Amino acid sequence: MKAFHLLLFHGSFIFPECILIFGLILLLMIDSTSDQKDTPWLYFISSTSLVMSITALLFRWREEPMISFSGNFQTNNFNEVFQFLILLCSTLCIPLSVEYIECTEMAITEFLLFVLTATLGGMFLCGANDLITIFVAPECFSLCSYLLSGYTKRDVRSNEATTKYLLMGGASSSILVHGFSWLYGSSGGEIELQEILNGLINTQMYNSPGISIALISITVGIGFKLSPAPSHQWTPDVYEGSPTPVVAFLSVTSKVAASASATRIFDIPFYFSSNEWHLLLEILAILSMILGNLIAITQTSMKRMLAYSSIGQIGYVIIGIIVGDSNDGYASMITYMLFYISMNLGTFARIVSFGPRTGTDNIRDYAGLYTKDPFLALSSALCLLSLGGIPPLAGFFGKLHLFWCGWQAGLYFLVSIGLLTSVVSIYYYLKIIKLLMTGRNKEITPHVRNYRRSPLRSNNSIELSMIVCVIASTIPGISMNPIIAIAQDTLF
């Protein structure tokens, strides 16, 4: 009985995660006892469990930080805001996937199970407080990601993407564990983050070569999840070969979860090596912003262009990680990631809607889409303009606050690179918008001429997600202050 009460006590700290686990069990039960005609229930249960989990998080807001499960899991506002972002991503991605699944005849239950399980892994990673949980949680996320990326088994590109993703993911995980082993040994056998720092102080190993090896290895391992340059090789192939709803899901959730983990790992165990990891991240940010935006200009595939764009975007996010909580770096990073979720998913909503109906992903094949589907074209244009940082859209104010925090922290060169590459990104975003809005008959492609709005009920779900994303992407600057204030409350 005592063990049962202890389980209930610790379980109360992971109540949002328990809701998702219950949703997973319910999905399996319904799928095994009903026929294919009851598929709307599967979407309903998945979306409801995600919304209920978000509600549970909001009710727990501003509670005192707590450590549960013998120090393995930490609950505080900082972790919960990242969990909220992951849940928000998943909630918006499920409506985006309805039409794609119907058109491609993918297995629905397994798809939803993998999405919810990956979400669960990302949430546990946000609250992980020891090395074992920090390793197991992203592996849970990664395994589901591998399965989702190869979900269309008959597609050669999907199989190629999965193979590359799996091999590079396995290699990065082994490098990450290697770094953890150096931390574990140098700290005298500690696995909790704060205890590792205390152990390094006691053993006088915080400036040893072993810590440098650990720092490099962990940076490489986490870099695979964030996909900054030069750890970006898998990103374009996975984006191009994977099903579009899967790409939309992975493009945001993996970065949110990895950012939450990176801030805690770099800020606590490597407290005495701040100059070293700042330098490493500055190099990654510069390479990401330059390579990501320059290579994106040359792409002809919409998904590959967004892949390189995401590499550049993570360079901006890294600026917030480097600044830290001293100059509102974390607050600006959280705010920008919230806007990035809406901007990116809104852009992918267009691809999900256009791709299955036309069978193309080429950027030039979108020419003249405004003449056939004005809502889709205008919504896409707003999201792309926000990604480029055009005022008065949300992306502009998100970047402005992020760069201002970096400037105040003395990262003048890094911010200058960010400003220049943002200007470069505007070029290829405007190029796409020009194609979308063209009305010249000579430029309108056969794919657009034959384009038909879907009569399926699933079209409404895509439009619902897109409306939410467009509204969030076009929030004017007057809403920035309360958003920044909420983000500042999350600092640990």
From Swiss-Prot:
TM annotation in the entry: 6-26, 39-59, 81-101, 106-126, 131-151, 165-185, 209-229, 277-297, 305-325, 329-349, 377-397, 400-420, 466-486
InterPro entries: NADH-Q_OxRdtase_suN/2, ND/Mrp_TM, Ndh2_N
Source domain of life: Eukaryota
Reaction(s) this enzyme catalyzes, per UniProt: a plastoquinone + NADH + (n+1) H(+)(in) = a plastoquinol + NAD(+) + n H(+)(out); a plastoquinone + NADPH + (n+1) H(+)(in) = a plastoquinol + NADP(+) + n H(+)(out)
UniProt main location, coarse: plastid
GO BP terms, alphabetized: ATP synthesis coupled electron transport; photosynthesis, light reaction
GO CC annotations, alphabetized: chloroplast thylakoid membrane
A Pfam family of this chain: Ndh2_N
Membrane topology designation: Multi-pass membrane protein
Cellular localization per UniProt: Plastid, Chloroplast thylakoid membrane
KW Transport (keyword) present: yes
Molecular function per GO: NADH dehydrogenase (ubiquinone) activity; quinone binding
Keyword entries, A-Z: Chloroplast, Membrane, NAD, NADP, Plastid, Plastoquinone, Quinone, Thylakoid, Translocase, Transmembrane, Transmembrane helix, Transport
EC identifiers of the protein: 7.1.1.-
Disulfide bridge partners, by residue number: none
Record-stated family: Belongs to the complex I subunit 2 family.
Subunit organization: NDH is composed of at least 16 different subunits, 5 of which are encoded in the nucleus.
Function of the protein: NDH shuttles electrons from NAD(P)H:plastoquinone, via FMN and iron-sulfur (Fe-S) centers, to quinones in the photosynthetic chain and possibly in a chloroplast respiratory chain. The immediate electron acceptor for the enzyme in this species is believed to be plastoquinone. Couples the redox reaction to proton translocation, and thus conserves the redox energy in a proton gradient.
Protein name: NAD(P)H-quinone oxidoreductase subunit 2 A, chloroplastic
